[in-house]
């Protein structure tokens, strides 16, 4: 802790800077330093169970976000013994909020739980993909999360964050904290590196924060380099925090 010069005599903390070294790559892969230097930010009354899931977007992109294709991916998850299905952007338009209760009942009848995608929104964010304007305002966010909880949704994937400025970093924690109040797990995408968040936030599941397989959809260059890039991730990305 560093004593502040402010009149309020508040104690502030500087962020950790860590270095992991070893004679081989083993300690780089196995390091726990990012988790060792943080403390849990809150406790939870919920029993969160991260697991495996199907995700249509990685194969069929936006065109797959419709009721019938998502039913197919629920059936696939059930056949594979997976716990979840993740429905990506545009579900509010292409499936509809009114049909989501029906869809979740079907998924649960197959033993599959549901994650839904959201834009982080905010004034910095001009993307078209929806739902938008549900996560960056505390009142709208809590209303939306109450609705999700009432339907039995188990988690959310929040995407397209605006850099690493303080306002955005606060938004991550506010989303996580409010989600915990409503029994929701959280995945971040298009986001900053996690820094010990698995220990800090009990409902945090994972973050993308890497130029990875999503880009195989967009460019042959990424396809040509996928095998090489995949061998780097354990040493340069997962050493900082889990995906």
Give the location of each predicted region.
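Aromatic- and carboxylate-enriched substrate-binding clefts and catalytic-loop regions
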Residues: 89-243
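An acidic-aromatic substrate-binding cleft motif
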Residues: 12-84
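Single conserved hydrophobic/aromatic residue that forms the stacking wall/gate
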Residues: 1-7, 11
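A generic structural signal for short, solvent-exposed coil/turn residues
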Residues: 2, 46-48, 79, 106, ...
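Short, solvent-exposed coil/turn linker segments
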Residues: 4, 23-24, 119
């Amino acid at each position: 802790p560093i004593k502040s010069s402010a009149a309020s005599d508040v104690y502030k903390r500087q962020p950790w800077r860590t270095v992991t070294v070893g004679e081989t790559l083993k300690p780089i892969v196995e390091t726990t330093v990012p988790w060792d230097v943080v403390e849990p930010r809150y406790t939870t009354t919920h029993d969160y169970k991260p697991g495996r899931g199907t995700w249509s977007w990685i194969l069929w992109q936006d065109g797959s976000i419709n009721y019938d294709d998502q039913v197919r991916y629920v059936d696939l998850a059930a056949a594979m013994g997976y716990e979840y299905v993740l429905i990506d952007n545009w579900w509010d338009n292409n499936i509809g909020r009114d049909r989501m209760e029906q869809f979740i009942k079907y998924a649960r009848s197959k033993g599959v739980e549901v994650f839904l995608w959201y834009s982080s929104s905010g004034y910095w964010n001009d993307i078209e993909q929806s739902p938008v304007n549900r996560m960056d305002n505390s009142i709208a966010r809590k209303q939306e999360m109450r609705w999700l909880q009432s339907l039995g949704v188990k988690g959310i994937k929040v995407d397209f964050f605006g850099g690493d400025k303080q306002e955005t970093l606060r938004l991550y924690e506010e989303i996580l904290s409010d989600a915990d109040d409503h029994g929701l797990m959280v995945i971040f995408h298009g986001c900053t590196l996690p820094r010990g968040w698995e220990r800090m936030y009990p409902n945090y599941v994972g973050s993308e924060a890497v130029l990875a397989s999503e880009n195989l959809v967009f460019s042959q260059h990424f396809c040509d380099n996928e095998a090489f890039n995949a061998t780097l991730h354990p040493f340069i990305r997962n050493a900082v925090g889990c995906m």
